[in-house]
Structures are given as C-alpha cells and as structure tokens.
C-alpha cells in the first residue's frame, strides 16, 4: 500500500506498480491523468502488468482512453458510473475505440440487475438519442437517506410507467 503521506504522489504509485506487478488500476480520471502526466514528464516506462483500468467518479476526458492505450495496447478500459444511492457503479462502457461523432465517452449500459431510464420533465421516456434526466432502478438502490425521510421521498419513488422504484 501507499502510505498516507504519499497517497497523491504518482512516483510512489509507479514504484508500487512496478514492485508488485499491479494488474488493475481503479481510480477517478483525474488521478489516472496525474499518473500519465508523471510518466510522460519523467520518461518512465509504463508497466504493462496493468491489464485493466477502471475509471469512474467523474467525466472521463475523450482523449484519456487513447492516452492509456498509447502505453499499453492490450489494456482493457472500463468506464463506470452511477450514484452512491444506487450501488455506486450501476452502468459501464467498455472502451473499444473513439468514435469521431462522440461529444464525450459514452455513459454505457446498465450492469446486471440495474436499470436506467432517460426521462423528460414529466417522467416520460425520452426518444433514443435525446437528452433527459437519468432515473436509476434495480437491486442496487439504497433504501433512502439515513434519518432524512423528506429527501428520501423526493429522490426515491415508485414509477408507475416503469413499474418499479427509481432514484432520481
């Protein structure tokens, strides 16, 4: 493990990756970017033991997956998302290359036992490829907020249209 005094030090991460042949990277995109910048600025060799990158917790810059693959073409990149109120990870996109028409890395498809609905301001399903807000449903939903029934009732409710409880 990286000790508390070095948890934001990419040199320390690199040393641990090399020392322990780390195979999985799991972080927010900003930390991954910090590591990639460290490698580039210091002429460090990327440890190809990393076979899987899990990126979540924030928007993933469009160029980041390609930056990773420039170091290791065999690395699998999974972009994850969701809400703390819904099992933290509830949607995933396996990166297979950048499409020129993308404005951003796609949010992905629901993980097993999870559902996503893109709805309008009336809670009606939006047509494919249109904007709306996301409702999350499935086995990963929390019961609600501890000792906050008002917020729980605002954010968690039953959707008659979808015949299930959702998180807004």
Placement of each model-derived feature along the sequence:
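AMP-dependent adenylate-forming
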Residues: 25, 76-79, 94-168
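Conserved AMP-binding/adenylation subdomain of ANL enzymes
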Residues: 1-23
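Gly/Ser/Thr-rich phosphate-binding loop
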Residues: 24-26, 36-106, 110-115, 122
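Short, solvent-exposed helix-helix connector turns and helix-capping sites enriched
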Residues: 9, 39-44, 147-148
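Conserved AMP-binding
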Residues: 5, 84, 138
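Activation segment
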Residues: 3, 26, 35-36, 64, ...
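Alpha-helix capping/helix-boundary segments
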Residues: 30-32, 60, 141
């Amino acid at each position: 493990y990286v000790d508390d005094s070095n948890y934001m030090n990419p040199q320390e991460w690199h040393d641990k990756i090399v020392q322990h042949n780390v195979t999985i990277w799991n972080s927010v995109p900003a930390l991954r970017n910090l590591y990639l910048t460290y490698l580039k600025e210091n002429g460090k060799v990327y440890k190809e033991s990393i076979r899987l990158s899990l990126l979540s917790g924030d928007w993933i810059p469009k160029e980041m997956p390609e930056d990773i693959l420039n170091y290791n073409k065999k690395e699998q990149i999974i972009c994850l998302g969701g809400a703390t109120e819904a099992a933290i990870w509830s949607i995933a996109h396996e990166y297979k290359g950048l499409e020129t028409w993308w404005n951003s890395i796609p949010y992905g498809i629901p993980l097993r036992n999870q559902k996503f609905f893109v709805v309008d301001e009336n809670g009606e399903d939006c047509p494919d490829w249109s904007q709306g807000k996301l409702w999350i449903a499935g086995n990963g939903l929390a019961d609600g907020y501890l000792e906050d029934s008002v917020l729980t009732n605002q954010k968690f409710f039953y959707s008659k249209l979808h015949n299930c409880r959702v998180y807004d």
